[in-house]
Amino acid sequence: IVLGLYIGFPRLNQLRFIARDPILTGILKVSKLPVQSTFRRFVNALHLNVARQMLTIMRTMRERVWAAANVKLEVVTIDTDTTVHTLYGQQMGGRKSYNPKNKGKKSYQPMLTFISETREYIWGGLRNGDRPTGKQIGDHIRDVCAALPPCVKQIYGRADSGFYCREAIEAYEECTARFVISGRKTSRLVEQLRQAEWKPSKKTDAGWECEFRYQPDGWKKDYRFVALRYEKTREEVESEETEQYQLFETSQYKYRVFVTDLTEPIDFVVWFYNQRGGAENLIKEANNDAGLAAHPSGRFDVNGNHFQLAMLAYNLNCWLMLFNRAPQTDATALQHTTL
């Protein structure tokens, strides 16, 4: 099943096309692959804990690959994000929630974290269509940090506004990780922006920038917030007179806000956060090439196990890239590639 996912056949009924492929059967040392019903019975028979066991297996494989490929990263950047898988059947766990491309349809919202330097998937899982809670986000970040190889000494974390919560900050701090998280709109934060002392931003694409200390409701202490302000065009102002839908609602400006424990200048914090766009590309690769969005069953546990099989196939490609680099090439210099 993993080899089928790896070479571009994400659905179990597609394996019949390569049932007698000489390369694949030669690798597996069989005359032909079993029929589709055999694969389906096998996947349905896997118990609920297999998904987490596969994450543990991938952790062990990662450590061995890094050792064999001479990857010695002491500093890593972890990018956490969610994606939306629209469902067209009656799969268990489907919810009508955030789904910008197919509004009103049920979906799953998996949560995934990648290592930016090597593009590896390190932790994640299939989730129902509801937005993740603060506890789920905090537990996920702790699991990510625990899954990193022992050679890693310093962690940097990046996440979008979907992870803007007290539990995420506390989880990063427990792991002694530095972080940058995009802020989410609240009335108090908007008021802080209006009161902030703005200055021209010469090293970013924004017109103005500012920073301030701020303690959101329910947080244990204040943190550093940095913000960029963009002036709206006349068309944007006119189009939003009837519908205000943006991060920070104001008649004249658009804002980008980040909470961070980095001490570097504002332009560096913004540049560092912008690099997490690679995580979205990695999710697209996993969805389109590794079959991540192919859910073979109506049962949530079966789809969760298949999710980890797809990500194992994705990681196999990343690990082969580590072995394929030139002897003196650093792992962080590898070019992005699709399966």
Stretch-by-stretch model annotation:
Residues 40-112:
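Active-site-proximal, Lys/Arg-enriched surface segment
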Residues 178-282, 286-288:
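An anionic, glycine-rich sequence signature occurring as long contiguous blocks
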Residues 15, 269-305, 309, 313-317:
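Short amphipathic alpha-helical "interface-anchor" segments enriched in bulky aromatics
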